[in-house]
């Protein structure tokens, strides 16, 4: 095994695992890291699919009991049937647009300038969404009981995954479509979209995790099938390094995020996106780093 290549695979696997489920865009980070490490050829793109699969398996393991309950309940449990339907209908919009526009998006938008711009814009959207969330319960009606009105208006409408309606799932599904733009963040689009549509922070985050399973699994199977002619046995060791690194880092990241959202909002991630995006644009326009278009 080429040690230098293995180190690159390890770094990219960790980057994928740490960014896939945070609202900071794993695709954007992989595009930038891939260019910095000179690991962005056709094999590198296949490698990205493999490590994304490693990350999604970490989510499957973390939520294995819920997944098993859904599978067991599909024949006769209305709650599990409704949950499965919600995941399916929320997945359809993004998959449909990806099939129609996927090639054009990869050809024209997968570059550092677009990624950095999406980082910055997405950061401001998160700040706005969090501001809206904090002020959700405010009322300016002097005739109303302020405390009562704030309690009614400020509480999220959906506190558990079982409360999620098909209409809510469809809205989150359309929000996920924004993630087709690299640098936007699939988890960021679905979590922030969920908050705006009345989901609690916990429900929005967990539903985002579950939405990732069919989306990333489907993309993995599709891309590996398309690129099967480029794969060889020599790639297995490098792919395995990245896969394991992505699985382990994603597993700990998911557990950390579930604890984090209990007491924190996403403003820190928003400022990270904005600052990082500005740095990337600055390095591009000053030619400090020769980013590829």
Swiss-Prot record:
SS bond list: none
Catalytic activity annotation: di-trans,octa-cis-undecaprenyl diphosphate + H2O = di-trans,octa-cis-undecaprenyl phosphate + phosphate + H(+)
This protein's record includes keyword Cell wall biogenesis/degradation: yes
Transmembrane portions of the chain: 3-23, 43-63, 85-105, 109-129, 203-223, 238-258, 269-289
GO biological process, one term: response to antibiotic
One Pfam family per UniProt: BacA
InterPro entries documented for this protein: UppP
Additional free-text comment from the UniProt record: Bacitracin is thought to be involved in the inhibition of peptidoglycan synthesis by sequestering undecaprenyl diphosphate, thereby reducing the pool of lipid carrier available.
GO MF annotation list: undecaprenyl-diphosphatase activity
Its membrane topology: Multi-pass membrane protein
Keyword Transport: no
Location of this chain's protein in the cell: Cell inner membrane
Name of the gene encoding the protein in the UniProt record: uppP
Function in brief: Catalyzes the dephosphorylation of undecaprenyl diphosphate (UPP). Confers resistance to bacitracin.
Enzyme class: hydrolase
Family assignment from sequence similarity: Belongs to the UppP family.
GO cellular component: plasma membrane
Protein name, per record: Undecaprenyl-diphosphatase
Its EC number(s): 3.6.1.27
Signal peptide (residue range): none
Main localisation: membrane
Annotated PANTHER family: UNDECAPRENYL-DIPHOSPHATASE
Keywords carried by this UniProt record: Antibiotic resistance, Cell inner membrane, Cell membrane, Cell shape, Cell wall biogenesis/degradation, Hydrolase, Membrane, Peptidoglycan synthesis, Transmembrane, Transmembrane helix
């Amino acid at each position: 095994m080429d040690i230098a290549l293995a180190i690159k695979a390890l770094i990219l696997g960790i980057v994928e695992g740490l960014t896939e489920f945070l609202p900071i865009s794993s695709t954007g980070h992989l595009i930038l890291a891939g260019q910095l490490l000179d690991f962005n050829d056709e094999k590198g793109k296949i490698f990205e699919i493999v490590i994304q699969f490693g990350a999604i398996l970490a989510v499957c393991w973390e939520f294995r009991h819920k997944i098993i309950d859904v599978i067991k309940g599909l024949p006769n449990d209305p709650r599990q049937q409704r949950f499965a339907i919600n995941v399916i209908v929320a997945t359809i919009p993004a998959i449909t647009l990806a099939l129609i526009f996927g090639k054009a998006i990869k050809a024209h938008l997968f570059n550092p300038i677009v990624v950095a711009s999406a980082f910055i814009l997405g950061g401001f959207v998160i700040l706005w969404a969090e501001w809206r969330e904090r002020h959700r319960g405010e009322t300016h009606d002097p005739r109303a009981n302020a405390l009562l009105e704030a309690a009614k208006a400020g509480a999220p409408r959906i506190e558990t995954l079982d409360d999620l309606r098909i209409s809510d799932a469809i809205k989150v599904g359309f929000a996920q479509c924004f993630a087709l733009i690299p640098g936007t963040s699939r988890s960021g689009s679905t979590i922030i979209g969920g908050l705006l549509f009345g989901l609690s922070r916990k429900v929005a985050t967990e539903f985002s995790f579950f939405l990732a399973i069919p989306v990333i699994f489907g993309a993995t199977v599709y891309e590996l099938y398309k690129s099967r002619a480029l794969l060889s046995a020599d790639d297995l060791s490098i792919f395995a390094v990245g896969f394991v690194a992505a699985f382990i880092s994603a597993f700990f990241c998911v557990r950390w995020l579930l604890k984090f959202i209990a007491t924190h909002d996403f403003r820190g991630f928003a400022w990270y996106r904005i600052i990082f995006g500005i740095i990337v644009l600055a390095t591009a326009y000053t030619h400090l780093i020769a980013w590829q278009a």
